[in-house]
From Swiss-Prot:
<keyword id="KW-0233">DNA recombination</keyword>
<keyword id="KW-0378">Hydrolase</keyword>
<dbReference type="GO" id="GO:0048476">
    <property type="term" value="C:Holliday junction resolvase complex"/>
</dbReference>
<keyword id="KW-0227">DNA damage</keyword>
<dbReference type="GO" id="GO:0006281">
    <property type="term" value="P:DNA repair"/>
</dbReference>
<keyword id="KW-0540">Nuclease</keyword>
<dbReference type="GO" id="GO:0000287">
    <property type="term" value="F:magnesium ion binding"/>
</dbReference>
<dbReference type="GO" id="GO:0008821">
    <property type="term" value="F:crossover junction DNA endonuclease activity"/>
</dbReference>
<dbReference type="GO" id="GO:0005737">
    <property type="term" value="C:cytoplasm"/>
</dbReference>
<keyword id="KW-0238">DNA-binding</keyword>
<keyword id="KW-0479">Metal-binding</keyword>
<keyword id="KW-0255">Endonuclease</keyword>
<feature type="active site">
    <location>
        <position position="140"/>
    </location>
</feature>
<feature type="binding site">
    <location>
        <position position="140"/>
    </location>
    <ligand>
        <name>Mg(2+) 1</name>
    </ligand>
</feature>
<keyword id="KW-0963">Cytoplasm</keyword>
<feature type="active site">
    <location>
        <position position="7"/>
    </location>
</feature>
<feature type="binding site">
    <location>
        <position position="7"/>
    </location>
    <ligand>
        <name>Mg(2+) 1</name>
    </ligand>
</feature>
Amino acid sequence: MLILGIDPGTAIMGYGLIEKKGNRLFPVDYACWRTPAHTPMPERLLMLYHEIEAYIKEKQPHHVAVEELFFNRNTTTAISVGQARGVVLLAAAQCGLPVYEYTPLQVKQAVAGYGRADKQQIQQMVRALLGLQEIPKPDDTADALAIAICHAHSVNLLNRMGGAL
């Protein structure tokens, strides 16, 4: 099963594609999409949409996992992340893919086993769980891989409980 994890953002959107074979996870591809800083927001969102849609069509993941929007003190940041999430949801829906959403707490618990794990602990666990030599950079990429790992663990749990994905 191929799982595409996405860490939404309008300037930098991290993505990580992992393959789940049995109980093992393998990194397939990870990087980020970037948009030019002074480009109007509608154009940035359109650029991201085209990148995501093309990537999904090329790589053919089975599931898309994305981080849920959480309360942010910076309203402008929260709005732009929400817009980026909308683009992810739209692109996945247009390609007929199911989208699974996880809170930052769920991602931390799934990856590090502790909901208050810091960014460095999560990055180290992503590196270890995927057998990578180095921590993926930038942080958005490591976050996207963590989201994909979280979904892979959720698939295991749902399968054990008899739920279908």
